[in-house]
Structures are given as C-alpha cells and as structure tokens.
Amino acid sequence: MIGPLNGLRVGLLTASASRLGGGVFEAVAAHAAMIRDMGGAVHVFALEDCFSHDDAPRFAGSPVTVLPVKGPQQIGFAPGMVRALLDADLDCLHLHGIWMYPSAAGAAWASRTGKPYFISPHGMLDPWITARGRWKKALARLGYERRGWSSAQALHALTLREARDISDETRRNDSFVIPNAGPDPIGTGTKAFPSPTMVYIGRIHPKKNLIALVQAWHGAVRPEGARLEIAGWGDPDDIALLQTVIAQGDGSARFLGPAFGAAKEALLARARFVVLPSHSEGLPMAILEAWAAGIPTVMTAECNLPEGFSAGAATECGRDVAAITAALDAAWELGAEEWQARSDAAIRLASDRFSPAAVSAAWATVYADTTENQRRGARLP
C-alpha cells in the first residue's frame, strides 16, 4: 500500500500483545492498523502470555513475535527479546508502556542501532501509579528506565497532563502530544433512548475505583429497571472483593466477566451510559469506544478527557462514594432529548479530534520527520 509511511519498518514493543494488556493492547492494535493503512510495515514484539496466540489475529497479518518470560511475570525478563529486535532490521522502534523488561530491551536496541526510538508511557507516569510499588519502580529507574528515557528520540504523551507528568519524571521537556484514536463513529442521527443501563468495560483493578462505584450505585436514586453491568477481567482477589460488594445490593448490579468482540458490542448497544470512575488513566479507550457508539459517559477528571465535559458528552464524577452517587443521580435525571444532545456531542468528538483520520495525520508527520531527522542526525524539534 502506498501512503505517507510507504516502506517504513516500524517495530511496536509492548508487555502484552493480548487482551491481558487491557487498554494498552487495544491502543497498540489500533496503532498497528494505522501504520499499515499509511503504507508502513509493522512488526509487533511482546512478552508471551496465555492469550498471545489467540489474539495475534488482531494484528491482521503483521508479524507478532512473543518471547517466553524467565522468572517473575511482573518483571517480564525475556532473554531473547533484544536479539529479536535487532534481527528485525527496523527503521524505528516504538515502546508502548513502561516499568517492565521491554523497556530495557528497547533501550538496548536504541543504544546498539542508533535508530529512532519512541516511548509512549500510556499514563504510567501518573503520580497515582508511581506512588504504588515504589521500590520496584525505583529499581526499574536505576536498572533501565532512565537509560531508555534519555536515549529516546522523543516521548509521546496522550494528553497535556501526561506531558507534564513525563517532564516531572524524566526531566525532558520535548514530549509531543497525540491522543489515542477511537473507532470510527457507528452511525449518526437520532438514536432510540436506551433502557436505564449503565456499563463498565475494562480491567478489574483498584485504580478503576469499582468498589466505590458499586457502593454509590447501591445508594443512588435509580429509575425503575436500572441496571449496572460490569464486564472485565483482573486479579481473582480483586474480582472476589467486587462480587462481595455487588452482593450487598438489591440485584440490580452484576459482574459479567470478560467481554470482547461481539459480546462487548452487545453491551455497548444496550448502554445508556458508560461509566469510568478511575483514580488514574492515560487516555481510556473505553471512553473513546463509547463516544464512537454515541454513548455519553460518566467519568472522573482523571480520565484526562476534559473535552468530554466541555462538549457535553460526559458527566464528571468524583472519586469518593458521595460524589459518584451525585453524578449517577444527575445522569439518570437526563430525559430523552437531553440524552440525545449528549449522544450527538459524543459522536462529534469521535468524528473530529479522536478520529482515526486526525490521529493518523499527526502520526504520519512524526514518523516522516523521524526518517528525515535520522538522516540529519537530529532529534525531533
């Protein structure tokens, strides 16, 4: 395919090329498709996990190399990764996500080849994240992260807020900001007013603040027949705690387990709202997917999508039970006409700033500049 990246060989490096990677996996899969659509050649590198081979088709025929892990999975030491990167004869390498061994492998590749190397932390330098597992992150900084940050051509931020976090952590002020792309919008125009169903889709993890959400749900003023449907995956202990709190209610909230593909589409199709009360996010794909489907959202400011509030596509909730309860009450008070206006605003955002076309154009400029700057021996301005 001929395009602005015609012939450019781009490596995408990440901890997980499967559903276990959550939103980062979805972002990498979308990024790979975008590069292919612009004429580039993509090679994906990741640590092997139980879903690696099942989910490889998400990369639509691009080569996916997964390396077996030696030792603790949370570190992800894969002794064959550096050699695999070097053997791929890449023009540039792009790391998605940090704090695991792929960061060390990427830094080694950059040092040995001198070729352009990009890092997208995906919100993993948010203070809420860096405050957790402090000693492990301190070892990672000393062992390889700082080396990688200094050797990168540039660091990529999803939002201006993340750009500040990157600067605070790395002492580099040259990061560039490009948001994740959402899916193309699913239809436009007037939608049928959905039944009172609120949906969460994503990882079951403390940072998602789901315990507070369910407790707020139990205390909210809800319309007749209202349901909270939580779909996701995570640590068994986190899931068990969530199910315990759900069981304290009246049966209107339920945990569905993981939802992918057609199951996820069916969930979105019946949702009046998508909710995300997170303590910390990079730029959540779940929200972009909701907006592309014309579904307004209830979310925290920590989702880093202030455009949603200003455009009227989202209701802001706080992170404590009382604030979430108030936001749920406000959402349920919206009538069909007000809800439709918010649905229209969501579609507009998905069609404009977060559209695949807009995001692709921004990345085409970055990658094209990469090749030019490589010839000149310069970093991105």
Residue ranges of model-derived segments:
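Conserved donor-binding/catalytic core segment of Leloir-type glycosyltransferases
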Residues: 156, 182, 190-220, 229
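Glycosyltransferase donor-sugar binding loop
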Residues: 44-51, 201, 227-241, 257-259
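N-terminal strand-loop element at the rim of the active site
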Residues: 5, 13-21, 27-76, 233
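Conserved acidic donor-binding segment of nucleotide-sugar-dependent glycosyltransferases
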Residues: 313-322, 331-336
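Membrane-proximal helix-turn-helix segments that form the acceptor-binding/catalytic region
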Residues: 112, 137-154
